[in-house]
């Protein structure tokens, strides 16, 4: 089918890549902050027998970037996903979510458990545990959003690609780093700013108390150099003993970028096994 535009009930338009055999169940990929559906292109050849849905999340890529920051709330975006799946005639989905997309996957699975058959959660979190942590993060995200709007995308991307979270990307070949940078620059500054304030980790309700409600196969992925998210994944794994955890060598926060073939192999084997 290729890329299609799907309009949800309030008129917001989403860009969605729909590849592979037509089926009522699909693998759905949700990218991270500043990413796009292009982040997952490498999976086309690694999951050739699956219907693969890659979505530009709200405010990213070719999807609309509404001016109203409240439109970006996790609750609204979860509802958008349900509408998108309805229009694509998807009864069940296997969700792959990275970082921001992983938080969205957690929330969708909690809201529509009957529509999720598996979760692949890469370098992500069920949220921040305390109100104090959430308030602090909201303030940081507002400052970052102001920076984006004030100084523009180029200045923001130059800052963002050099934060400690992405330090391991400096080991990547220059052409790969250029591709990542170019993808980030194709975003909309209003969309990124509103994404930070509307569905940043601080704005999202904490789901830690509900993790044990998850009753589908779960694969947790993190890079060995990403100590923070490895610790989070270990904690989630203890709460979900039947989950599978993979700590990928020679990778940081963006495992699917730093070790794409190994990431694809791990995901393919997991999805085949369930």
From Swiss-Prot:
**Single biological process term from Gene Ontology:** menaquinone biosynthetic process
For the keyword Lyase, the answer is yes
Catalytic EC class? lyase
> What InterPro entries does UniProt report for this protein, alphabetically?
AB_hydrolase_1, AB_hydrolase_fold, Epox_hydrolase-like, SHCHC_synthase_MenH
**What GO terms fall under cellular component here?**
membrane
Question: Per its record, what are the GO molecular function terms?
Answer: 2-succinyl-6-hydroxy-2,4-cyclohexadiene-1-carboxylate synthase activity
Query: Which pathway, metabolic or otherwise, does it act in?
Result: Quinol/quinone metabolism; 1,4-dihydroxy-2-naphthoate biosynthesis; 1,4-dihydroxy-2-naphthoate from chorismate: step 3/7; Quinol/quinone metabolism; menaquinone biosynthesis
As given in the record, the signal peptide range reads: none
The record places domain AB hydrolase-1 at 26-259
Q: Which reaction does it catalyse?
A: 5-enolpyruvoyl-6-hydroxy-2-succinyl-cyclohex-3-ene-1-carboxylate = (1R,6R)-6-hydroxy-2-succinyl-cyclohexa-2,4-diene-1-carboxylate + pyruvate
As recorded in UniProt, its EC number(s) are: 4.2.99.20
**Keywords linked to the UniProt accession:** Lyase, Menaquinone biosynthesis
Q: Which SUPFAM superfamilies match?
A: alpha/beta-Hydrolases
Q: Organism's domain of life?
A: Bacteria
**Sorted alphabetically, which Pfam families does this protein's record hold?**
Abhydrolase_1
Function in brief: Catalyzes a proton abstraction reaction that results in 2,5-elimination of pyruvate from 2-succinyl-5-enolpyruvyl-6-hydroxy-3-cyclohexene-1-carboxylate (SEPHCHC) and the formation of 2-succinyl-6-hydroxy-2,4-cyclohexadiene-1-carboxylate (SHCHC).
Could you say which protein family the record assigns here? Belongs to the AB hydrolase superfamily. MenH family.
What quaternary structure, including any partners, is listed in this protein's UniProt entry?
A: Monomer.
What this protein is called in its record is Putative 2-succinyl-6-hydroxy-2,4-cyclohexadiene-1-carboxylate synthase
This protein's species is Bacillus subtilis (strain 168)
Q: Gene of origin?
A: menH
